[in-house]
Amino acid sequence: MRSGVIAQKVGMTRVYNDAGEHVPVTVLRMDGCQVVATRTVEKNGYTAVQLGAGQAKVKNTSKAMRGNFAVANVEPKAKLAEFRVSEDNLLEIGTELKAGHFAAGQLVDVTGTTIGKGFAGAMKRHGFGGLRATHGVSVSHRSHGSTGSRQDPGKVFKNKKMAGHMGQTRVTTQNLEVVSTDEDRGLILIKGAVPGSKGAWIIVRDAVKSAAK
């Protein structure tokens, strides 16, 4: 099990394959993705690498984190993430990961924070059909209707689909295909959509379920 990478979402575009078909892709950019710390069995009880990406202003970095970056001899990073790895895949502190970490055709799991939509009703949030347009219904056409409760159990069960805050949640999309990489510009092109807005930090790992396909 090897480390993933931290990348930043640039946006979406399309590319053409050898058959002349256009393929929608999400463009991710890797910016100074380096190992800033390691975790070992002897010291921490598990093996992992902590990666940092992007650039952070020194004034916006805490004193403790400035000390950690100084020990690692790397510039302050805007985003940190830890990846569990096997012992033989531990990387040296300061090692920089490039877009060539992944190969074209490889399947990856992508994790990001979805775009927040604010408070949304049941029709938009869960695809409810709403109430009838006529026949006595007024004002509440887009309501979710009854929540299914009576004297017994006398409550609304937890996780009942209702109106509420939509989006702004951490989501992992599995088995997305890497269409191509550009190591010179630090770009990874992934087929399809990736959760998050433009500029969002994205975690890209080797797919864990690819063997089952």
Swiss-Prot record:
Pfam family, one: Ribosomal_L3
Functional description taken from the UniProt entry: One of the primary rRNA binding proteins, it binds directly near the 3'-end of the 23S rRNA, where it nucleates assembly of the 50S subunit.
GO BP annotation list: translation
Quaternary structure, from the entry: Part of the 50S ribosomal subunit. Forms a cluster with proteins L14 and L19.
N5-methylglutamine: modified positions: Q151
Coiled coil regions, renumbered to chain: none
Family per record: Belongs to the universal ribosomal protein uL3 family.
Entries under InterPro entries matching the protein: Ribosomal_uL3, Ribosomal_uL3_bac/org-type, Ribosomal_uL3_CS, Transl_B-barrel_sf
Alphabetical UniProt keywords: Methylation, Ribonucleoprotein, Ribosomal protein, RNA-binding, rRNA-binding
Name listed for the protein in its UniProt record: Large ribosomal subunit protein uL3
Gene3D superfamilies: 3.30.160.810, Translation factors (2.40.30.10)
PANTHER family named in the record: 50S RIBOSOMAL PROTEIN L3, LARGE RIBOSOMAL SUBUNIT PROTEIN UL3C
A Gene Ontology molecular function term of the record: rRNA binding
Post-translational modification: Methylated by PrmB.
GO CC annotations, alphabetized: cytosolic large ribosomal subunit
